[in-house]
Curated annotation (Swiss-Prot):
It comes from Acidiphilium cryptum (strain JF-5). Pathway: One-carbon metabolism; tetrahydrofolate interconversion. The gene is folD. Belongs to the tetrahydrofolate dehydrogenase/cyclohydrolase family. This is Bifunctional protein FolD. NADP(+) binds at G162, R163, S164, S187, I228. The keyword GTP-binding does not apply. GO terms for biological process: L-histidine biosynthetic process; methionine biosynthetic process; purine nucleotide biosynthetic process; tetrahydrofolate interconversion. The keyword Transcription regulation does not apply. One of its GO terms (molecular function) is methenyltetrahydrofolate cyclohydrolase activity. Its EC number is 1.5.1.5, 3.5.4.9. SUPFAM superfamilies: Aminoacid dehydrogenase-like, N-terminal domain (SSF53223), NAD(P)-binding Rossmann-fold domains (SSF51735). GO terms for cellular component: cytosol.
Amino acid sequence: MAARVIDGKAVAAALRAEVAARAATLPYAPGLAVVLVGEDPASQVYVRNKERAAKAAGFASETIRLPASASQAELLALIARLNHDPAVDGILVQLPLPAGIDPQAVIRAIDPAKDVDGFHPDNVAALALGTPFLVPCTPRGVMKLLAAAGIAPRGARALVLGRSNIVGRPMAALLLAADATVTIAHSRTRDLAAECRRAEILIAAVGRAEMVRGDWVSPGATVIDVGINRTAAGGLVGDVAYAEAAAVAGAITPVPGGVGPMTIACLLENTLIAAAARR
């Protein structure tokens, strides 16, 4: 039997509509400032998508573009200005940054109360301690997809493939908080396929095209594919070999149309949360 497809576009559309409705009840428009340094084509696409989504939700959205030649000091000065701007509730600096700018220094410079990416050490610590405030958008989106699909992590064996600070580590923390039994696997894990086969919930976030094959998936497991990889032909594939995995899994997210739309929807929700907490 083919796996049930978890439609991230539909879940994201519902969340965006909910955020817009909640924002409309406020006496102010939540303010989101997006900073783009340089002219990376993929980053420009992401920023345009975020800007459109924010405006559609009724937010006051501002995109600030700096040249690739901008110094770290210039970027930090801009962040300091945004930190003190009462009309700005959320600040997002689009990654990756040009060479010569330390991304960790930039992340640390953002006011944690406006850190809608959830990357500031204060927000990372709050998540690890079980008292989350602003949570990284992609892991937050994955948890919402699981909930929408009626898949409860409590008591389940969950494996997160990937240990990045952006997805893997916060994903594991959220699953642990939801009472899953969590394993983090990575490039140094022995017998990776066997570890994946033990999982009832398998979340792939490693950035390698179609790395997870069908025989890595336990029959009936839920497979969440966070990866977005461009093929030589210009198409998009995830970290999971979709057709193979879909023949075995109980439920699966597609690429595109799975986790991706949830990331932007959760960015809007984080901005709304930040605005409500500040004003």
